[in-house]
Regions:
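Short helix-to-coil transition segments within interhelical loops
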Residues: 39-45
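Alpha-helix N-cap/helix-start motif at helix boundaries, enriched for small hydrophobics
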Residues: 47-49
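Hydrophobic alpha-helical transmembrane segments of membrane proteins
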Residues: 1-33, 51-186
Length: 186
C-alpha cells in the first residue's frame, strides 16, 4: 500500500521546484500575486504558460532521472530480468503520469486562488490514497503492474502515456489561456 501511495503521490511532484513561495501559496496567494505582476508587463499569456511548462519539464527531467536511476540501482529484485530499454519504458510511463497530473496542478495554480489550489491538492492526495487502498485490497500493485506493462510493451506503453499526458497538458493550456483572459487577480 505505502509504495503505491508513495509513487502515486511523489512522482507527479518531481516536476515542481519547492521554495518558500510554494509552501506559503495557500496563505499569501503568491501565485496570484506573481500573475498580477506579470500581467503589468508586456508578456503574453502564451509566454506565461510556456514558461510554466518549461518550469515543469526541466525539474521533471532532472529529478526524474535521479529518482529512477537511484530506484534502478537499489530495487534490484523488482526489476530483475528487465532490459535497460524496458526500465526506461517503465520510467517514461511514470514520467507521463507525472505530466498528466501536473496538467491539473498547473491549471489550478494559474487559474484559481491559493486556497482552491490547496483544496485541489488535497483532493488529489485523497484520490491517491483511495487508489492505493483499492489496489491493496484487490492485491494489485501499481508498481508491479507498470513493471509488467513495461516488460510486455516497452515501446507502446510510454508512447500511449506520452500521448495521454501531453493531451492533458494541451487541454490544460487551452483552459488556462481562456481563464487568464477573464481572471480577476485582485
Amino acid at each position: 500500500f505505502f509504495v503505491d501511495f508513495y509513487f502515486l503521490t511523489l512522482v507527479p511532484i518531481l516536476g515542481f521546484i519547492f521554495n518558500k513561495k510554494s509552501f506559503n501559496y495557500h496563505r499569501d496567494d503568491s501565485y496570484t500575486v506573481n500573475l498580477a505582476h506579470l500581467r503589468t508587463m508586456p508578456i503574453s499569456f502564451e509566454a506565461m504558460i510556456a514558461s510554466r511548462i518549461i518550469q515543469l519539464i526541466i525539474p521533471l527531467a532532472v529529478n526524474g532521472t535521479i529518482f529512477f536511476t537511484v530506484q534502478y540501482l537499489f530495487a534490484e529484485r523488482l526489476f530483475d530480468g528487465m532490459t535497460v530499454a524496458q526500465y526506461i519504458s517503465y520510467a517514461l510511463v511514470w514520467l507521463g503520469y507525472a505530466v498528466l497530473l501536473s496538467a491539473v496542478y498547473i491549471y489550478s495554480e494559474l487559474t484559481r486562488s491559493g486556497k482552491v489550489y490547496l483544496g485541489v491538492t488535497i483532493v488529489l492526495m485523497v484520490c491517491n490514497i483511495a487508489a492505493a487502498l483499492i489496489c491493496w485490497f484487490a492485491k494489485v500493485s501499481v508498481i508491479v503492474f507498470t513493471v509488467e506493462v513495461a516488460r510486455q510493451s516497452p515501446l507502446l506503453a510510454p508512447i500511449i502515456m506520452s500521448l495521454v499526458s501531453w493531451l492533458a497538458i494541451y487541454i490544460s493550456i487551452i483552459g488556462v489561456r481562456r481563464k487568464l483572459k477573464t481572471r480577476d487577480l485582485m
